[in-house]
Structure formats: C-alpha cells, structure tokens
C-alpha cells in the first residue's frame, strides 16, 4: 500500500474540527487515506471506544437538579468522575436539558429514550458527552412529585448554576388554600429545612420499622450497660426513641427558620392563617453521590493487580 501524503494544514483543520491531539489527527487521516470527513468519524468512533473504557471508573461527583412546572416537580442526579466537570458549562447544559425532559416522563427508562433538543435520545447524548467531556457520566436516578392542588417547593443547595447543585429537594403541599403565593413560600422554606435536616420520613409511620427496632435495641443495651434498674430501663428507652423521632421525622423536627416550633406546628399555624388544611404529601431529597461506594486503591495495589494479570 502506498504511503498517504498528509499535509500539516489537513492535520490542523482536523484538530480544529474535533479538538483531538495532533498525533491522533495524523493517524486518523492516514487510516482514512486523507478523507477529512471520514477522519472526523474515525476520531468520534475512537472517542466513543475510549468512553467505553471510562465506564469502568466510579462516577460519584456531578450534579443534582430540581425542576418545577406548576403542580409537577422532578429531581434528577447525573454523575461524573470529578467535581471539575460539574463546573463545565457543557455538562451543566446537559443536566438542565435532561431535567426539562424528566418532568414529562414517568421513569428513568422513558427518560433515557426521550429526545433531546438536538434530536438524539438522552442515552445517546450522554454517551456523546462522555467522549467530548472525557469522563464517565451516569444518568443515575430521577423522581417525580405531583400534587392535585396546592404547591411544590424546591431548593437547590450549593448552586453552581440555576437549579443545579449538590443537594436538590422538592416538597409537595396538598391544600385548597387560595393564597398560593404564601403556600409556595411555605413549601420553599420546608424544602430548605429538608436540605439542612435530612429527615428520613414525613411521620412516624413512614419510618422503616427495622430501623426503629434497631435503635430501640441499641438504647436498651446501652441502658443495661449503664447499670440502670430494669423498672426504669423501658421508660428511658421510650424517651430516647421519642428523641430519635424528633431527629429524623420531618413533622417532629424543630423548624429551621424558628426552632421554637416543630414543622407540624408551623404547618398548623399556616393552615389556620390561610383558612385551609395543609398536608405534606411527599418530599424528595437527592444528595450528590449518596449511597455510591467508591473503591479505593493505592498505587502499589494497582501495580500488583497488573502484574498478576
């Protein structure tokens, strides 16, 4: 096969079109016999192949997003490998566009198939962004919240751009109150409270009973070790369980904006003022990377693994 003559100007043009390295551009032009368009496709394919390798790395950074449209809200989480990417405008636009679509779908599978503004599916667009951004990206989860009447409050903590940040919260208030502005303001305050206090459930009944029993057992054993008489251990355990509920149950927590009142008391006062019942139907709190286990390896372990392998 005869040597293909590749000009420096072709290499430069291909680099400008793709942002790929000089040597990669030269190799692509040689492989495609100097055809610039085919060389672009060659590099794109190569980029996507590299992205497939990146998929083995843990993506625990990134962004969460909250979007509200009337009486419907959605929270999404999209992960990257480094915090640096979260400040990348291209990644921020990707997350925003996905959140805008998520509000109209029912689950993550439907979201992956939804069409982005560029005509590609969400799943396809994420893969292309893996290639161009150069990190593994994962559309991890989404959840929709709806109320039939009332208000939805949203709050994003540590915002890096509009509605994008480390923690995203939605709170649904069901109410027939006519003053929607005050209802929305209350929903927003409760959303801020949820971000800061991280409740586990709205009320007692929503708590995982296995968790409650585990706490009860710990308190019981601790009281026994302290040498307390059996006749008062049960009272002490019940007192500690009540304190535990006050720490993790939303309605029993002291309100972030007025710690002399519980959230339940704040809602009761607002209902009286607005002349209609108010009920928290649901809250969603996404904290970036929660529950993702990051595998830690040191350099010596990595070398040993390669030598074995």
UniProtKB/Swiss-Prot annotation:
Protein name as it appears in the record: Elongation factor Ts
InterPro entries hit by this protein: EF-Ts_dimer_sf (IPR036402), Transl_elong_EFTs/EF1B (IPR001816), Transl_elong_EFTs/EF1B_dimer (IPR014039), Transl_elong_Ts_CS (IPR018101), UBA-like_sf (IPR009060)
Function: Associates with the EF-Tu.GDP complex and induces the exchange of GDP to GTP. It remains bound to the aminoacyl-tRNA.EF-Tu.GTP complex up to the GTP hydrolysis stage on the ribosome.
Gene3D superfamilies, A to Z: 1.10.286.20, DNA helicase RuvA subunit, C-terminal domain, Elongation factor Ts, dimerisation domain
GO MF terms, alphabetically ordered: translation elongation factor activity
Recorded GO CC terms: cytoplasm
Source organism of this protein record: Rickettsia bellii (strain OSU 85-389)
Protein family according to the UniProt entry: Belongs to the EF-Ts family.
Superkingdom assignment: Bacteria
Subcellular location: Cytoplasm
PROSITE patterns per record: EF_TS_1 (PS01126), EF_TS_2 (PS01127)
Pfam families attached to this UniProt entry: EF_TS
Region Involved in Mg(2+) ion dislocation from EF-Tu, residue ranges: 82-85
Keywords from the named record: Cytoplasm, Elongation factor, Protein biosynthesis
């Amino acid at each position: 096969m005869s040597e293909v003559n590749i000009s420096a100007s072709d290499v430069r043009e291909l680099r400008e079109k793709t942002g790929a390295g000089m040597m990669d551009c030269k190799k692509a032009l040689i492989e495609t016999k100097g055809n610039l368009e085919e060389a672009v496709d060659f590099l794109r394919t190569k980029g996507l192949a590299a992205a497939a390798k990146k998929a083995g790395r843990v993506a625990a950074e990134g962004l969460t997003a909250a979007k509200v449209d009337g009486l419907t809200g959605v929270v999404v989480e999209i992960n990257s490998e480094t915090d640096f990417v979260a400040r990348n405008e291209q990644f921020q636009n990707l997350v925003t566009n996905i959140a805008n679509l998520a509000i109209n779908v029912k689950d993550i599978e439907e979201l992956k198939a939804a069409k982005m503004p560029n005509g590609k599916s969400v799943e396809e667009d994420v893969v292309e962004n893996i290639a161009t951004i150069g990190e593994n990206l994962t559309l991890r989860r989404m959840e929709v919240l709806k109320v039939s009447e009332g208000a939805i409050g949203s709050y994003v903590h540590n915002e890096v751009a509009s509605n994008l940040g480390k923690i995203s919260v939605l709170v649904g208030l069901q109410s027939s109150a006519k003053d929607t502005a005050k209802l929305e303001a209350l929903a927003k305050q409760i959303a801020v409270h949820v971000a800061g206090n991280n409740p586990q459930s709205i009320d007692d009944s929503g708590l995982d009973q296995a968790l409650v029993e585990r706490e009860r057992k710990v308190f019981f054993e601790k009281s026994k070790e302290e040498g307390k008489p059996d006749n008062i251990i049960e009272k002490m355990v019940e007192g500690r369980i009540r304190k535990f509920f006050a720490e993790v149950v939303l309605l029993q927590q002291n309100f972030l904006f007025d710690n002399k009142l519980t959230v339940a008391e704040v809602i009761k006062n607002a209902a009286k003022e607005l002349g209609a019942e108010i009920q928290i139907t649901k809250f969603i709190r996404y904290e970036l990377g929660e529950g993702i286990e990051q595998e830690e390896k040191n350099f010596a372990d990595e070398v040993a693994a390669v030598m074995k392998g």
